[in-house]
Amino acid sequence: MENNNFRDSVLAILVCQFIGPNVFIIIGSIGSVIGVKIMEMYPHYCENHGIYIDKTSVGIAHGIYGIILGFIGIYVFLFVLLFILSIIFSIIYVISKRLSS
């Protein structure tokens, strides 16, 4: 049986120091973009259908609803990421068990 302490410590340093803090920045950015893109549909719909909207009100609504939908987008992205990672780890686990037997 081989010693994996060095590999595990290097992986822990990489994940904790570099990937860990930046994951929340990336997830927050993706969530905010999702929220703003959803809110951009409203003024485009109004302009295409000839409905008058006040640009200031739309800007305020963009900000407020974009933030709210951004937080929802963050959680949706987290659940999708968790689902994908669980599938990847399950596949790796099954492959490692088959190779060891």
Swiss-Prot record:
Keywords: Membrane, Transmembrane, Transmembrane helix. One of its GO terms (cellular component) is membrane. It is a multi-pass membrane protein. Its main location: membrane. It is found in: Membrane. The chain crosses the membrane at residues 10-30, 67-87. This is Uncharacterized protein R40. It comes from Acanthamoeba polyphaga mimivirus.
